[in-house]
Regions:
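Extracytoplasmic beta-strand-rich oligomerization domains located immediately C-terminal to a leader/signal peptide
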Residues: 1-131, 141, 227-228, 233
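Short linear sequence signals and composition-biased patches located at protein termini or domain-edge surfaces
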Residues: 42-44, 129-233
Length: 233
């Protein structure tokens, strides 16, 4: 669907920003600043994978010395169960469709408290004006069946588990060459005339294959996003 393609394009653009910062950046690095953090789903019926992407930016003010204030942002993509009511199944009780919604959130780093600011209340540098660049979770697309992220190294091999600042693959934190992304979405309305079991293969993990007996059409969009700012160290 077009909405799923738009989502994938958005994620690709953010992945390409992962790890970017200006050469004179003065923000002290912490474990919260790893460029890409992928959290794998533990229950495919209730959750999808999650990705957090961190990159830097700068605000210029010629009247100040130094003229630049450096910033750090974190963008997250994650799933929650859909809140769309399944009208065909809802009688006395409210029943939601068997799908996920994908959300996006953007936060800004607070160097003073060494924590991510609340995007609902954070402000522009040196101002009391709300920073409109950040936001709490915003729904991007619904009717999603799964969202998968895989960290891939320079040899095209899957990094498993995905690296964090402290786990067994932490030496690969800055060696993620690409991120494989798979989004599977179902049609809003029934598509096929006949209801029968249909299987949609998952990316790299047979346990995540989607097997449903219904009339809905399911399509997967799979793409590899290059991390152009990683692997340079």
């Amino acid at each position: 669907s077009q909405s799923a393609r738009n989502l994938v394009g958005m994620i690709v653009r953010d992945v390409r920003m992962a790890g970017f910062k200006y050469f004179n950046d003065t923000i002290k690095e912490t474990n919260d600043h790893i460029p890409i953090k992928i959290t794998k789903s533990k229950n495919f019926n209730t959750d999808c994978d999650k990705i957090e992407i961190v990159y830097g930016d700068a605000v210029a003010n010629a009247s100040k010395n130094p003229p630049y204030t450096y910033e750090r942002f974190r963008v997250s993509y994650f799933c929650e169960r859909s809140k769309i009511v399944d009208k065909a199944k809802s009688g006395g009780n409210t029943v939601y469709i068997d799908a996920f919604a994908i959300y996006k959130k953007k936060e800004k780093w607070d160097a003073n408290s060494s924590s991510w600011k609340n995007p609902d209340t954070d402000t522009l540098v040196g101002s009391s004006v709300k920073d409109e660049r950040t936001y709490s979770k915003e729904k991007v697309v619904d009717y999603v069946q799964d969202l998968v992220f895989h960290a891939i190294d320079e040899n095209g091999k899957l990094i498993s588990p995905p690296p964090t600042a402290t786990n067994s693959t932490k030496e690969f934190v800055y060696k993620i060459k690409t991120v494989d992304i798979a989004v599977t979405k179902r049609s809003r309305k029934e598509f096929f005339k006949e209801s029968k079991i249909r299987t949609k293969k998952s990316l790299e993990d047979d346990k995540r294959d989607i097997k449903k007996t219904d009339k809905y059409l399911r399509e997967s969009i799979i793409i590899s996003a290059n991390t152009r700012n990683l692997g340079l160290l």
